Amino acid sequence: MSHNFRNVTMPTALQQLGSMTHRYTINFIYNDLEDFRVTASVRGASIPEAIRHLIGFYPISMTMVGDSIINVECSQKTALRYKGRVIDEKGEPAEYANVVLLSPADSSFLAGGVSNESGYFVIPCNVRRVIAKVTYVGYKSKLWTATSPDLGTIRLQADRYTLKGVTVQGHRLSYKPSPNGLNVIVKGSQLEQFGSAKEMIKHLPLVMGDGTVAGHGTPQIYINNKLVRDASELERLQTAEVLSAEIITRPGAEYASDVTSVIRLKTVRRQGEGWSGSLWGNVEKSKGMLAIANTSLNYRLRNGMDFFIRANAADSKGRITATSNDQLKATDTWDYHSHIKWRNDYKFIYGDVGWNWEINDRHSLGITYSAIGTIKGKRTITKTEQVWRNGEHFSDDDNRSVTKTQPNLSNSINTYYVGRLGKWGIDFSADYYGSHTDSEMAGGTDDASVGSSTNTRSDLWAEKLTVSAPMPAGTLSFGEETSYTNRKADFTQSGFSADTHIRQRTAIWSLYADYALPVGKKLNLSASLRLQNEHNRYDVDGKKDDELSHDYHVLIPKLSMSYADGGWQHSLAFATYRYNPSYSIMSSSVNYRSKYEYDTGNPFLQPMTKYYLSWTTVWKWLTVEAYYAYIKNSFRTFQTAYDDVSHPGVIITDYRNTPKIQNYGVTLNTSPTIGIWHLNYTARLFFSDADLAPMGITHYWNELCTQFRLDNTFTLPYNWTANITASLTPYNKSDVAITKTAASVDLRISKKWLKSKNLQLSLYANDIFHTNYKEMTAYGGINVRTQFKEYDSTQCVGIEFTYSFNTVRSRYKGTRAGSEEKNRL
């Protein structure tokens, strides 16, 4: 509700609020509150929020009985009430003036209060003769003996000796610990200056430069309750609309079994009606080029309905260069010296249209249709290669392959309902996702040509229901999630491998429950359990393959305990995660990369399971986490000879399960604010101990690995902001690779324009010193050594602009179902 109250009694204001709602019943005694007067402007508040706003500093209490009854009463029952009004020398109300009543006998404190927006105060006190004292910053204190409860109008005089300017400066903590991670304040902080939510997320505590959460992998991201499906959603959301970000490093059972971290963005609650919208654009130049344009429109009705449409177009031309020095030991010893260039040329469009209706603060529903189209898709790989066989020069080859993706459109529909029935909460979502892609590859050398075509069609249906239940102690939520996936893939080729025709159908049904119990004021316990059932049918050339048609029934438990005291919070947590391999790495088709390089998937891959134990300590702006992870059947690429008789010298890359890996690590983050400088420093130290001998791999290490990220933001006058971020990954020997040092320094300068600050321009330069190379020597297979140096054109300059008008908060609350299966597709 929104309303202006002007010098009315508290009972009158409560009666007006009662007439605006059918949900709440407001109970009060008229004579108990008639001495209290209010002047206030309330905007976009619920009924309980409005009552708290009106109460202010008055000695009035508000209590809730159930979900719909509100009792309001004076908390100090006295026969006498001292009341009056404080004004300044110009006759304007003096808000927040301190009024105290003292004993005439010894000047001891009897009672006190604070004036409200209109200068009024009411102080319950049964003593009939008091000393009244009024103090107000910048004005002379007033002291007199009062014998009547009616203190009248008190006019204050300015203090001629008041300092002309006094600045009281403090620093609000940018984040605080939550039961499952960190809550970060965005609104009013330096993070608000980064333009889009996509850019802002990179500067959150614990988030590394590649967008992963330190030690917890790639996060799922939600805007309010809606799962983000594509990066353009984050580009469309402006940081001025974001209230806070919660970084969840211990996700509960309501999340899919492969979700190891979550970032939930909460938007500012705003009210309004009519049209609103935004424009966003970005142009970036590197060795390639990137151009993105985005627009969104929303029309809101007074009854809480929203109609929205969004559109996005992107033109991406990526360039990657690499040199390699590889060796294969088979019947003969083969050495390859190569120079490779990748040229990616893609054009995309995105659009969605939807409707949602926030009926009241207990019920909302909506539906969205989304489409993502590929207008152009082309990848060109050129490779100049010199080949030696047993130390003698064998050939010089110029390889070239061009893969073209035909124009296509993927479609998705999401519908949801979020509401409360009595004390029960309900969150329901249903989804459909469908895609159809055709691609053709043509390539080879001057001596021979090859070709292949791939046709893939995927359909996903899913639904998810979460219920929160009332409990005598603690909180309980439970639910179920169901998904069905039907995927067909046809691969034909010109003779370098074999044709494949695969149909894979997967049905997943899960039950889950979360329970959290506070023990006293300092200790919190939580437990969650997910039962996941999977049925797979794998058909090859129209016939079921029993060896690949697996059924799984697994329990996924999670436990945590947190203790908070004196600004410190300590958490001990255990979690189980389960990952199904993506459909792309389960393909059995053999793809041509060059004359001596093929790649394929592995339909025999087993699901991966990770057991994770962690200890986390948070104090003010400091976070430390130590962890241990035990991983079974992790996925890794594997290289070996393809066919030493028919295709001598060809290396094929596929995927295998690693029997076990043990990871140990410590993550440190510190995010203090010092004047205009906002520091966000993250350091990681970790070991990886993999059991690779059973796979036939002979070279592997488990030495210390480190990563460092120093993120500096400077809040400057006149709405300017500067950010400089440095990342460093030192030389390390871990797993099957020896990796050389990589580093990057990025600079960004932003300025907000217009009185409303609705226009923002940003200039940025990434990898200024051209040092972000990937350079390593790896032994990731049997009798294969790979040395390469690759640069992904991360050095670039760009300009970004954002303009929004009549900004209102999105009310869409759909959470999306079947997220794990859609990510696999």
Spans of model-derived segments:
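Short, acidic, small-residue-rich periplasmic hinge/interaction motif at the N-terminus
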Residues: 14, 18-21, 58, 65-79, ...
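N-terminal periplasmic accessory domains that precede
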Residues: 70-73, 149-157, 197-200, 231-232, ...
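Short, acidic Ser/Thr/Gly-rich low-complexity loop/linker segments typical of extracellular
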Residues: 105-120
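Short acidic/polar hinge/loop motifs at secondary-structure boundaries
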Residues: 122-124, 209, 224-252, 295
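Face-selective signature of the C-terminal outer-membrane beta-barrel domain
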Residues: 348-376, 400-541, 562-571, 622-626, ...
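Outer-membrane beta-barrel signature, preferentially recognizing the C-terminal barrel domain
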Residues: 404, 504, 547-550, 578-632, ...
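Outer membrane beta-barrel strand-and-loop segments of large Gram-negative receptors
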Residues: 460-464, 508-510, 606, 612, ...
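Surface-exposed extracellular loop regions of Gram-negative outer-membrane beta-barrel proteins
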Residues: 488, 533-538, 563-612, 628-648, ...
